[in-house]
Amino acid sequence: MSNKSEAAILKNLEKLAVHNDPIDQKLYSQYDVKRGLRNANGTGVLVGLTRIGDVVGYELKDGQKIAIPGRLVYRGYNVEDLIKDADKNKQFGYEQCAYLLLFGELPNQAKLEAFSNYLGECRVLPANFTEDMIMKAPSNDIMNKMARGVLASYSYDDDPENRSVSNVIKQCIQLIARFSTLAAYGYQAKRRYYDNKSLFIHNPKPELSTAENFLRLIRSDKQYTRLEAEILDLALILHAEHGGGNNSSLTVHVVSSADTDTYSAMAAAVGSLKGRRHGGANIKVMEMMDDIKANVKDWTSEKEVGNYLKNIATKEAGDRSGLIYGMGHAIYTISDPREVLLKAKAKKLAKEKGFLEEFALYDLIEKLSPAIIQEVHHSDKKICANVDMYSGLVYSMLNIPRELFTPIFAISRIAGWSAHRIEEIVSGGRIYRPAYKNISKEREFVPLMDRK
């Protein structure tokens, strides 16, 4: 079939789909459909219970949302306390965070060392995996490559269908350990086969943290500073878990409830996170910032920056979506604790890397945006910057290319996904089966030879 013929066929099929699939938006209100599993007041529909993580941004009083400063809680502990403890002991904290999410308890020093050593031993991919599953089948999209890598791992597992808790824990720990390697090698394959650049394949070092190993694997000289590794470690901690209701974690629960294998569940979660509405938000922030920097002459002028932000909010500038990316969150109202913690460390990195002028622009946008959004939308809803406002800037200062931004999210969130899979199995939940109402009328069948 020629390309022209295929295009014509697909165009006709597209017309049918566009004509027959749309649903009158009024019907969603008529049938009280909780679109996106959201209630009318913006809160999420309660579909499950979890002990793993909690996202706190408001309190409910008489059915009304009352804004409060945001908190991110892992297994009952405020994440800010975990980070402070790691800083105090001059340790990287992601591994301790992963242990806590998986097993529900804070490890002592001996348990943490044993767990970190186990992760280190698991970072190396199976024999021939790199050559056969990554280099021989590169992808221009690293999240796509990671999903394929997860599914391919099934074939390298001696007992992939064993869904005992101990075996699932083993599978999850191996995936947590290997995600940074999968992402880094997928990136190197893309560089070689799609970007025509030099290929560097370094072996992970078992004694290094997840953050250190990742920086080592993506850089040709394998070098990084302590501050660089610390801020990446912080980003990994802050993205590791966000409650059971976020799209990718819910995906893990839904797919796991069907009693499938670990690799299928995790690949589905990667597919969810790959979506532009979920894992790609910090890239949208960076694209918006590129546009602002190109069109605003004086980055220090509140008037000039504010006027351009208003043009973005009124769909007269930027990508014409009307969104000031990096602002607002479904749950956080007064503050996103992840943004607060990452911003503080980002300023230190900006000073080291010579990015203070750019950091000040981000800070000004964060300051001006809430009032502009409220003015344009005639709303008094409280709006705060979210973690995506600064995460992209942090990765850029680390000289990490944008195609790795969402994979870093996955490297972090695999710990939370693993905890949710184990929780779903241990809790023995039923298969997810929500309702969909069919609104089509029944029609009289027309035999093939009688159709026009």
Protein language model features and the residues they cover:
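Non-transmembrane, aqueous-exposed alpha-helical and coiled segments at domain scale
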Residues: M1-K452
